[in-house]
Each structure stands twice: as C-alpha cells, then as structure tokens.
Amino acid sequence: LDFRGEPEAQVTGRGPLGALTSYNHLPFVLAPERDPIRTHQPGPEGLSPQLVGHWYLQVTVDSADVIVEGLEAIARVDSAAVFHCAAGKDRTGIFAAALLSVVGAREEEIIADYQASESSLERVFDRLRVAPYGFVLRSCNRTGLPFRPCGLCCAPAA
C-alpha cells in the first residue's frame, strides 16, 4: 500500500522491488484550503502542538476512505503486507494506528509504535533530501512540521 501523493509516486517510482509485488496506490489527501499548516503561518518557534494535532485530525478525516480501503486490502491477503509513504512517519503512522486499533492493540501500544519512528527520522530526512524532490526539503524549515514535502502529498488547489 503506497500512501504517497501522485507527484511523489511519479517522481520516485515503486523502487527496486516494485515489479515483484502487487501494488495499491492509496494516496492520503488533504485539500489545501483545509490544511491548517497552510492556512496558519507558524511563528518563529515553529508549529504549536495544537496546530500539528489539527493537521493530523484533518488528514485522518479527509483520508478516511483511503484508510478503510487499505484495511480492507490487508484483510483480503493471506500473506505479508507492506504499507508506506515517503518518510514512514505521518501518513504511515496514521494508517498503522488504525490497523493496530482494529486488531485490538491498547492505546499505549499504538502510541509507543508511533513514537518509535522518531528514532530514525533524521536518517529518513537525509535520504529524502537526496531524492528527486529533495530540493523542496532542503528549502523547508522542519521545526515541528509533520512530514509533508510542501504539498507533494496534498490534493492540488481547485
């Protein structure tokens, strides 16, 4: 399951194992006009926890159909399943939380699973900075931003 936006998927492709697996492109979307990070300019201290929380809530609400479709796809397979976005933190984290929730994980376990991704985030950003769209990341201030390479995963403006 690939949760990257269409521009991300086109630019970086499916990777070296792409031809060996089945593939479901299920991009998480967030309409720019409902993106609290785009509609509220952060101050010099970065984004407030409330604003980041609002971003997560809005992405989850806007992508609810994608989350359900991904859960249904996993339920249909009799083998391993892999799901990812570009960094494996925000979109992947939202989906992982939903998956863990439906299989009965406790809230503390879900939170711990999400927090575990923080330990490798700098290495992930280092990798993404050299990706074909890395110029976008190199120009972004990452102070508190949930990973979203400046609109690559969002729906285009209408």
What are the residue ranges of the model-derived segments?
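Cys-dependent protein tyrosine phosphatase-like superfamily
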Residues: 1-82, 94-158
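Ser/Thr-glycine-rich phosphate-binding loops at phosphate-binding pockets of nucleotides
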Residues: 87, 91-92
